């Protein structure tokens, strides 16, 4: 349990007593296990995007790798809500399409050779760099993705 008014840093317990104002009703379409995981993905995404990247500002170019996973999807939603230009990578065209429906500006398939050049072509004129990469996928993102970063900008894993 964590991220509440009285336990902001988090604690681990089998039972906990909370004020009713600290609770939210789980969405009816989620199982108990799915609902329990939602704060974990959200908090991880929040820390990666807002705390570590330092780029939660309108117009910033954000690359979210491995789109389709819970944390990556939450970062996409947070960044889009901040009016960032969100770009995604995935090995699945279906996941890229879904990410665009959720607010991504564009996406690349990391299985394709030269994906980083394709991404560079998608970036807005006058801002041909990525301000931050939030990576949950690994692979060649470190090698290829960091070339897209403006010098001294954050890479959050």
Positions of the model-derived regions?
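Glycine-rich cofactor phosphate-binding loops and adjacent beta1-alpha1 units
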Residues: 56-57, 87, 97, 101-102, ...
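Mid-domain Rossmann-like dinucleotide-binding core that forms the NAD(H)/NADP(H) cofactor-binding site
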Residues: 35-113
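Glycine-rich phosphate/adenylate-binding loop and adjacent beta-alpha elements
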Residues: 1-25, 38
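Hydrophobic alpha-helical segments typical of transmembrane helices
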Residues: 11-12, 22, 44, 75, ...
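Glycine/charged-rich beta-loop-alpha catalytic/anionic-binding loops adjacent to active sites
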Residues: 22-33, 60
């Amino acid at each position: 349990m964590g991220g509440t008014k009285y336990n902001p840093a988090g604690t681990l317990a089998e039972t906990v007593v909370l004020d009713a104002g600290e609770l939210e009703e789980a969405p009816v379409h989620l199982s108990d296990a799915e609902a329990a995981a939602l704060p974990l993905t959200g908090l991880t995404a929040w820390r990666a995007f807002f705390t570590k990247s330092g780029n939660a500002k309108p117009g910033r170019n954000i690359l979210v790798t491995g789109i389709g996973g819970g944390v990556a999807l939450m970062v996409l939603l947070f960044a889009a809500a901040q009016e960032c230009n969100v770009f995604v990578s995935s090995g699945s065209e279906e996941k890229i399409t879904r990410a665009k429906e959720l607010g991504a500006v564009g996406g690349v398939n990391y299985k394709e050779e030269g994906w980083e050049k394709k991404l560079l072509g998608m970036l807005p004129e006058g801002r041909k760099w990525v301000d931050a990469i939030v990576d949950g996928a690994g692979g060649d993102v470190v090698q290829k993705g960091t070339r897209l970063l403006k010098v001294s900008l954050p890479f959050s894993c």
